[in-house]
UniProtKB/Swiss-Prot annotation:
Function: Catalyzes the transfer of the phosphoribosyl group of 5-phosphorylribose-1-pyrophosphate (PRPP) to anthranilate to yield N-(5'-phosphoribosyl)-anthranilate (PRA).
Name the record gives this protein: Anthranilate phosphoribosyltransferase
Quaternary state and interactors: Homodimer.
Amino acids binding Mg(2+) 2: 247-248
Keyword Glycosyltransferase belongs to the record: yes
Cofactor(s) demanded: Mg(2+)
Record key words, sorted: Amino-acid biosynthesis, Aromatic amino acid biosynthesis, Glycosyltransferase, Magnesium, Metal-binding, Transferase, Tryptophan biosynthesis
Gene Ontology terms for molecular function: anthranilate phosphoribosyltransferase activity; magnesium ion binding
Length: 366
């Protein structure tokens, strides 16, 4: 999909001139925005034309009203129109479709970087991964922090990320580098200190436009909204929310999955016990600073058994299932059996450990 880099129109779908009082007035009255209003507001934010008070008011009012999938789609599309572009056509020609494994953050649980570990395992299983991420949101160490501690350079530009994807099977898009215009909202978001609609935009704005994903959402009431955005894109995505609050597929209890495929959304309850996993305790999955989490990554990839490995295998399998969903012939249970087997084999064979070593070398040499 090609997005225009031009700023959004200053008029609404009805032809009226747009303004902050008009947009904020609808939101504070609990009314959904009309078509184009969310895009206009995000355009103001991304071009530096919105004042911090306007950005904060928009973010909080949108949260209190509860955003619709249409509104969030407009916000994400404007963000993507301002993002640095990856050569997606060349990527698809070389390796086919890709998958993202990411979460909103904000669950406050301070777990290890499960999505980062799962991404490495998925790539080692032969599924191309382009991950979009940032530094810590609510934990001591975000995915970017842990990758740095492992020796992976996170400051690669679009061509370098594309080359990493082609050569190694995995690439990392560091959000501040690929979304420089988002800096206007980022500072305000952190000052607000409570989750808003901005917290769900990261996983929706991967500049490589992967068509598949395992996307975690810490906010149960917004997970279905995210699923609606992916459905409109006709992506194959599992939007997941651990019923313990994690923005991952959890092993401590059940998870809720919004399965997005062929433009439809199905809501499911997923219990890992049915696939042979033991119940874990949240304490088993706790992380630490970047060095501590990097050590846990190395241990899992070296073959260490236990709750962290179980959670990594489960989430890696979920991403493989989402990728399989790009085919209209994919079946749910067989896809899970295949995904779990491939994820386990990627670790046990040493392939995941070797892929990380190659990724570190490649990123340091480009």
């Amino acid at each position: 999909m090609v997005l225009s880099s031009q700023p959004p129109s200053s008029r609404s779908a009805t032809g009226s001139v747009l303004s902050w009082p008009q947009v904020l007035g609808r939101l504070t009255a609990g009314q959904d925005l009309t078509r184009g209003q969310a895009a206009w507001a995000m355009g103001q934010v991304m071009t530096g034309n919105a004042r911090p008070a306007q950005i904060a008011a928009f973010a909080v009012a949108m949260k209190m009203k509860v955003p619709t999938a249409a509104e969030v789609s407009e916000l994400a599309d404007v963000m993507l129109s301002h993002a640095r572009k990856l050569p997606t056509e060349a990527i698809c020609q070389d390796i086919g479709e890709t998958v993202d494994i990411a979460g909103t953050g904000g669950d406050g649980a301070n777990t290890v970087n499960l999505s980062t570990m799962a991404a490495i395992v998925v790539a080692a299983a032969g599924v191309p991964v382009v991950k979009h991420g940032n530094r810590a949101s609510s934990s001591l160490s975000g995915g970017a922090d842990t990758l740095e501690a492992l020796g992976v350079r996170i400051d690669l530009g679009p061509e370098q990320v594309a080359n990493s994807l082609a050569e190694i099977g995995i690439g990392f898009c560091f959000a501040p580098l690929f979304q420089p215009s988002y800096r206007y909202a980022s500072a305000v978001r952190h000052e607000i200190g409570v989750p808003t609609v901005f917290n769900i935009l990261g996983p929706l704005t991967n500049p490589a436009w992967p068509r598949a994903g395992l996307i975690g959402c810490a906010f149960g009431n917004l997970a279905e909204v995210m699923a609606g955005v992916f459905a409109a894109r006709r992506s194959s995505v599992l939007v997941v929310h651990g019923d313990d609050g994690l923005d991952e597929l959890t092993t401590t209890t059940t998870s809720t999955i919004w399965r997005v495929q062929a433009g439809t959304v199905d809501k499911l309850t997923f219990d890992p016990v049915e696939f042979g996993f033991a119940r874990a305790h949240l304490d088993d999955l706790l992380g630490g600073d970047a060095q501590t989490n990097a050590a846990k990554v190395r241990a899992v990839l070296a073959g260490a058994k236990g709750p962290v490995r179980d959670a990594v295998v489960l989430n890696a399998a979920g991403a493989i299932v989402a990728y399989a969903g790009l085919s209209s012939h994919a079946e749910w249970s067989p896809a899970w059996d295949d995904g779990l087997a491939r994820a386990s084999a990627a670790i046990d064979s040493g392939a995941a450990e070797q892929l990380l070593a190659r990724w570190v070398r490649f990123s340091q040499q480009v």
